[in-house]
């Protein structure tokens, strides 16, 4: 490969890297609350009583996930899709890093909680699981009225 070919190749590679970096920077901003955090259905006690314990464990863990990922952030948002910029928070490197670290810490905490729950939660009474699910669901329903307090 001659010098001209090497320079051309280097130029093309640098242009691609620059384009990729700009595309990453101009990409969609991460949400304060991720889009996968939602409850598709709320339940009545009678419906929960008809479920098997394994189904209740899954519901319980999903509600824990939503609570862990939403409640610490309700001063900013109660629904997925809200970004720092949409709240008027400057989109600085420091703020993006802080959000990423918070998201990672929340994910790690949830994974550790889930690991513990998988070991210990099967020993819980079905009636306690049902009561906890109903309590968590009522808590999550209250988020729909959060804006009423502003």
Regions found by a protein language model. Give the residues of each.
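Mid-chain, structured segments of secreted extracytoplasmic proteins
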Residues: 68-115
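Generic preference for flexible, low-structure residues
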Residues: 17, 76, 81-83, 122, ...
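Non-transmembrane, amphipathic alpha-helical segments
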Residues: 52-63, 91-94, 98, 121-124, ...
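A generic structural signal for ordered alpha-helices
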Residues: 34, 38, 45, 52, ...
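Immediate post-signal-peptide N-terminus of mature secreted/exported proteins
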Residues: 22-72, 76, 150
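Generic structural concept
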Residues: 61-64, 68, 103, 133, ...
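Bacterial Sec-dependent N-terminal signal peptides
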Residues: 1-29
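C-terminal amphipathic alpha-helix
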Residues: 109-150
């Amino acid at each position: 490969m001659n010098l001209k070919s090497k320079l051309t190749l280097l130029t093309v590679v640098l242009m691609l890297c620059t384009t990729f970096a700009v595309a990453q920077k101009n990409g969609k901003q991460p949400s304060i609350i991720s889009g996968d955090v939602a409850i598709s259905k709320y339940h009545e006690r009678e419906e929960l009583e008809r479920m098997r314990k394994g189904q209740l464990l899954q519901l319980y863990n999903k509600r824990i996930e939503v609570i862990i990922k939403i409640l610490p952030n309700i001063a900013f948002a109660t629904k997925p899709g809200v970004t720092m910029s949409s709240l008027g928070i400057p989109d600085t490197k420091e703020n993006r890093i802080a959000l990423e670290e918070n998201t990672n810490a929340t994910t790690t905490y949830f994974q550790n909680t889930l690991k513990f729950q998988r070991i210990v939660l099967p020993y819980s009474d079905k009636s306690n699981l049902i009561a906890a699910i109903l309590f968590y669901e009522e808590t999550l329903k209250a988020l729909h009225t959060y804006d009423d307090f502003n």
